[in-house]
C-alpha cells in the first residue's frame, strides 16, 4: 500500500499550485457587467437584487457602487450613471468607487442590460465559493487546535458548512429602527390575514386561538407523566402541520419505531381502531378506508426518524439538511430524556439542561418551532387532584426557563377509572412567553390514537 493510499501524501495533483496564498474565487468581468446592466436599466436592478447582496462582490468598490444603486432604487429614484455619481458624491464615496469615469466604464462593458441577471448569478456563485473556502479554513483551524469536546467541534463544523448556503447572513446586532421595522411589518402582515393564524397550526382550535399557532424560533415543551398520551399529542401536531397544511415536519422518535408511528397515524386519520390494526381484525370496510387514507396522506411532507441512540449532533445535522432540501417548518422530538449527548457529563441534570438550551438555539437558527416532549416527575401523583405543575419538569429547571410555551397534559381518567371526565383531557398551557396561560379542554379518543377538539355543546 502506498503512502497516498493511507492518506499521508501531500494530496495535491502534479503541477497544482503549491503557493500558500491563492486569490479567492471571483469574476471581475461578471461583477462589472452586472453593475453595468444595473446602471442601464431599472429592470436589471430588479433582476440582480434577487440573487446578489453587496457583500457578494469581491472588489470593494463594486460593493460601494451596488449599495448606492440599491439606495436610489429603494427610494424610486433613477439608477443611471448621473444619479449614482451624484449619490456617491453626497456620501463622500465617489473616489472610493473609482470615480465618475469608472461608472461610465461599467456601462460601456455591456451592450445591453438584458443579461444582468445571468451575470449576477455568476457573482453569487463565486461569493458562495469564497464562503466555502472561508468555512473550510475555519474548520481546518478548529481541527488542528482541537479545543473542547470532539462532538462539539463536529457540530461547529456542521454549522460552518450550513452557514455557507443556509439562511441569509445577518449582523450580530441591529439598530432599534431595524428591529421596529420588522415588528411593524409583522403587525401589518397579521392585519392583512384578517385574524387568521400566523404560526404553524396545532390542529386544536382553542389552543391555536390562544397561541396563534406555533411560531418560528419557539421551543415548545409538551410534558406529562408516562402513558398519558404525550406521543399521541405530538403526532396530532405533526398531522395538523404536515397532512392538513402541507408544512414539512420531522418527527424524531426515540421511543417508538416507524411502523408503530405509521400505524397510529393511519388509525387517527382513517378513524379505524388502533387495536384492530394491531390484531389484524380489520374488516373489508376498514380496509377500504385505510387504503383511501393511505392515498390521501402518502405525499404529506412528514419525515420520521426512529434511529436508536440519537445524539443531539445528529438531530441538528438532519434538521439543517431538511431545512435546505425541503424548507423544514417544524421539528418534534419524542422525548427529551431519551436523548444522548455522546460524551461524558457530570450529571444527567446538566446533560438535559444542555439539550434544552441547544434545542432552543436550533429553533432560532432554523427559524422553526421545535416541540420537545418531556417526562414529569412523580409530583402530580403525590397531590390530591393529580394536577401537574411546572415544578414537576423532570431532571432540569432549565427546561422551563428555555421554553417559550409549556403544555402540561393531564387526564383525570388515567387516575380514576370511573371518573365522569372519561374521554376528556386537559392541555394546561402553564407557560406562554408571548401571551396568556389557559387550560384547554380536548377530547381523548384513545381507540383511534388521537386527541381532538371537544364537540360543540
UniProtKB/Swiss-Prot annotation:
Spans annotated as Disordered: 1-26
GO biological process: DNA replication, synthesis of primer
Domain named SF4 helicase: residues: 193-457
Keywords tagged on the record: ATP-binding, DNA replication, DNA-binding, Helicase, Hydrolase, Isomerase, Nucleotide-binding, Primosome
Keyword ATP-binding: yes
GO CC terms, sorted: cytosol; primosome complex
Subunit structure as annotated in this protein's UniProt entry: Homohexamer.
PANTHER family on file: REPLICATIVE DNA HELICASE (PTHR30153:SF2), REPLICATIVE DNA HELICASE DNAB (PTHR30153)
Name of the protein: Replicative DNA helicase DnaB
Organism: Leifsonia xyli subsp. xyli (strain CTCB07)
Gene name for this UniProt entry: dnaB
Amino acid at each position: 500500500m502506498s503512502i497516498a493510499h493511507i492518506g499521508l501524501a501531500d494530496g495535491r495533483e502534479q503541477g497544482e499550485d503549491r503557493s500558500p496564498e491563492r486569490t479567492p474565487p471571483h469574476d471581475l468581468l461578471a461583477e462589472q457587467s452586472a453593475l453595468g446592466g444595473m446602471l442601464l436599466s431599472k429592470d436589471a436592478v430588479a433582476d440582480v437584487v434577487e440573487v446578489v447582496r453587496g457583500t457578494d462582490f469581491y472588489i470593494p468598490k463594486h460593493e460601494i457602487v451596488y449599495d448606492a444603486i440599491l439606495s436610489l432604487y429603494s427610494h424610486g429614484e433613477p439608477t443611471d450613471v448621473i444619479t449614482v455619481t451624484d449619490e456617491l458624491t453626497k456620501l463622500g464615496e465617489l473616489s472610493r468607487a473609482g470615480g465618475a469615469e469608472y461608472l461610465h466604464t461599467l456601462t460601456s462593458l455591456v451592450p445591453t442590460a438584458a443579461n444582468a441577471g445571468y451575470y449576477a448569478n455568476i457573482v453569487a456563485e463565486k461569493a458562495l465559493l469564497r464562503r466555502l473556502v472561508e468555512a473550510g479554513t475555519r474548520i481546518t483551524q478548529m481541527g488542528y487546535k482541537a479545543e473542547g469536546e470532539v462532538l462539539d467541534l463536529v457540530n461547529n463544523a456542521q454549522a460552518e458548512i450550513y452557514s455557507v448556503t443556509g439562511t441569509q447572513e445577518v449582523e450580530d446586532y441591529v439598530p432599534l429602527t431595524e428591529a421596529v421595522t420588522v415588528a411593524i411589518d409583522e403587525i401589518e402582515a397579521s392585519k392583512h390575514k384578517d385574524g387568521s393564524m400566523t404560526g404553524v397550526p396545532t390542529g386544536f382550535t382553542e389552543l391555536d386561538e390562544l397561541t396563534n399557532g406555533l411560531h418560528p424560533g419557539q421551543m415548545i415543551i409538551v410534558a406529562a407523566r408516562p402513558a398519558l398520551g404525550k406521543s399521541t399529542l405530538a403526532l396530532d401536531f405533526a398531522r395538523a402541520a404536515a397532512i392538513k397544511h402541507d408544512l414539512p415536519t420531522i418527527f424524531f422518535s426515540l421511543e417508538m419505531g416507524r411502523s408503530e408511528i405509521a400505524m397510529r397515524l393511519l388509525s387517527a386519520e382513517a378513524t379505524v381502531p388502533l387495536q384492530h390494526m394491531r390484531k389484524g381484525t380489520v374488516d373489508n370496510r376498514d380496509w377500504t378506508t385505510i387504503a383511501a387514507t393511505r392515498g390521501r396522506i402518502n405525499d404529506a411532507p412528514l419525515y420520521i426518524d426512529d434511529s436508536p441512540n440519537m445524539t443531539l449532533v445528529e438531530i441538528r445535522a438532519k434538521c439543517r439538511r431538511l431545512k435546505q432540501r425541503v424548507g423544514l417548518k417544524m421539528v418534534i422530538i419524542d422525548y427529551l430524556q431519551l436523548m444522548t449527548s455522546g460524551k461524558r457529563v457530570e450529571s444527567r441534570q446538566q446533560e438535559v439542561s444542555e439539550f434544552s438550551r441547544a434545542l432552543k438555539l436550533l429553533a432560532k437558527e432554523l427559524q422553526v418551532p421545535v416541540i420537545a416532549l418531556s417526562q414529569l416527575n412523580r409530583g402530580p401523583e403525590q397531590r390530591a387532584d393529580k394536577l401537574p405543575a411546572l415544578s414537576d419538569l423532570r431532571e432540569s429547571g432549565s427546561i422551563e426557563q428555555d421554553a417559550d410555551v409549556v403544555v402540561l397534559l393531564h387526564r383525570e381518567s388515567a387516575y380514576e377509572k370511573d371518573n365522569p371526565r372519561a374521554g376528556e383531557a386537559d392541555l394546561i398551557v402553564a407557560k406562554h412567553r408571548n401571551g396568556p396561560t389557559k387550560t384547554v379542554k380536548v377530547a381523548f379518543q384513545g381507540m383511534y390514537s388521537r386527541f381532538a377538539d371537544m364537540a360543540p355543546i
